[in-house]
């Protein structure tokens, strides 16, 4: 839905991100216990995702901090909104298309096999015999071990958005907000907004706004269920509801609060094909 190609952004920037709507069939996906050097939000639209830390069902938002272990994930089915992004560490987020190219190159080398979210090296090949698949790809791309930051949160946070009270937004008639949380030192915010018919919601925070239900217009352009809007820092827009609307906001880090180190990417990344996901897990729920 959103990546560096769609938005014409630098895939090597420390504020790079990826967003998609994933549909997963019963029994199609599982993942071992692992961690990442980036952060992610997941919002379940329908179905369930079961982790050791808890079960996500419709309306549950998961925040997965950089550096924190989670899983295993042994059951996932349904539809989930996913946003993956570089966190406070400044490690950035390796672009999906870059990972797809790297995975293809690793397969061509025939030094191991990708299986069940893991990379299993052939006997006699240097490196860990068994390694998290994404980690192996990151190390191939960056030509160095993955540097996991010390997690600011020790485990994922799962929020039942329907259990959080909604309050009127001051100065905005017909608009209520459920504040789902503010996370990390980069002040990532998440919220849900309920708009009555004819209500208006001006927005200006960096991040992605997903329409969960309803219809109307964004600055005159029509919106409907699953319309998504991305705002860069400093941009603004306004939702005008034609019918009752439910809008999910998933914020991204404030740029000035990200450590000033650029993600390392190979020069060949610029020529990589679009819309790639490295593992089955990435194309399904990007574990």
What feature does the model see in each segment?
Residues 1-43, 48-287:
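Jelly-roll (double-stranded beta-helix
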């Amino acid at each position: 839905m959103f990546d560096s190609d769609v938005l014409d952004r630098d895939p090597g920037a420390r504020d790079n991100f990826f967003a998609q709507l994933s549909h997963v069939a019963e029994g199609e996906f599982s993942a071992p216990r692992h961690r990442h050097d980036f952060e992610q939000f997941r919002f379940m639209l329908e179905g369930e995702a079961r982790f050791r830390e808890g079960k996500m069902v419709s309306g549950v938002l998961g925040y997965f901090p950089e550096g924190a272990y989670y899983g295993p994930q042994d059951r996932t089915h349904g539809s989930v909104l996913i946003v993956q992004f570089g966190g406070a560490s400044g490690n950035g987020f390796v672009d999906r298309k870059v990972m797809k190219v790297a995975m293809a190159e690793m397969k061509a080398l025939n030094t191991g096999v990708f299986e069940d979210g893991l990379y299993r090296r052939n006997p006699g090949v240097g490196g860990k015999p068994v390694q998290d698949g994404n980690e192996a790809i990151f190390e191939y791309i960056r030509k160095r071990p993955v540097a996991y930051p010390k997690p600011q949160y020790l485990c994922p946070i799962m929020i039942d958005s329907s259990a959080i009270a909604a309050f009127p937004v001051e100065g905005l008639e017909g608009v209520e907000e459920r504040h789902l949380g503010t996370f990390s030192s980069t002040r990532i915010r998440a919220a849900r907004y309920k708009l009555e018919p004819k209500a208006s919601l001006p927005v200006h925070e960096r991040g992605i706004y997903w329409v969960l239900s309803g219809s109307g217009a964004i600055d005159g352009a029509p919106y409907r269920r699953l319309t998504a809007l991305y705002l860069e820092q400093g941009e603004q827009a306004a939702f005008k509801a034609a019918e009752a609307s439910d809008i999910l906001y998933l914020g991204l880090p404030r740029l000035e609060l990200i450590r000033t180190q650029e993600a390392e990417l190979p020069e060949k990344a610029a020529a990589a094909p679009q819309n790639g996901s490295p593992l089955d897990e990435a194309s399904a729920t990007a574990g």
